Curated annotation (Swiss-Prot):
Protein's recorded name: PRKCH upstream open reading frame 2
GO terms, molecular function: protein serine/threonine kinase binding; protein serine/threonine kinase inhibitor activity; translation regulator activity
Effect of residue 6 to S/T: Abolishes kinase inhibitor activity and converts peptide to a substrate for PRKCH and PRKCE but not for PRKCA
GO biological process: cellular response to amino acid starvation; negative regulation of protein serine/threonine kinase activity; negative regulation of translation; positive regulation of translation in response to stress
Gene name of this polypeptide: PRKCH
Keyword DNA-binding carried by entry: no
Leftover remarks: Suppresses proliferation and migration of cancer cells.
Subunit field text: Interacts with protein kinase C eta as well as other protein kinases including PRKCD, PRKCQ and PRKCE but not with PRKCG or PRKCZ; the interactions lead to inhibition of kinase activity.
A matching Pfam family: PRKCH_uORF2
Keywords annotated in UniProt: Protein kinase inhibitor, Stress response, Translation regulation
Length: 26
């Protein structure tokens, strides 16, 4: 499941951004 770790690593920095976007949209 190396791809899973890579995805998590790529999403890690993007998660906060997504949260901010969702908060602004909500």
């Amino acid at each position: 499941m190396a791809s899973r770790g890579a995805l998590r690593r790529c999403l890690s920095p993007g998660l906060p951004r997504l949260l901010h976007l969702s908060r602004g949209l909500a």
